[in-house]
Regions:
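N-terminal acidic leader/helix
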Residues: 2-28
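Short, charge-rich amphipathic interface segments used for partner binding and complex assembly
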Residues: 29-64
Length: 65
């Protein structure tokens, strides 16, 4: 499968992170930290479309500190 362009990929990642933040606000049992780490390790890192620094910046933009 071909890689999608970087701008689209970043948009998808940002939307996913924002959705995770929304879920954390509505579900007190949801572990945002663990899910963010899992998302990075199992999806972002293997796909190698963005760097760790870019991912961390998107986390900040989504409200994950």
């Amino acid at each position: 499968m071909d890689k999608i362009d970087k701008k689209t990929y970043i948009g998808i990642v940002k939307f996913t992170l924002e959705s995770m933040v929304d879920l954390a606000k509505s579900d007190k049992n949801y572990d945002l930290t663990a899910d963010t780490i899992h998302y990075y390790e199992k999806t972002i890192k293997p796909e190698m479309q963005i760097s760790q620094d870019e991912f961390l910046e998107l986390c900040k933009e989504a409200g994950i500190k």
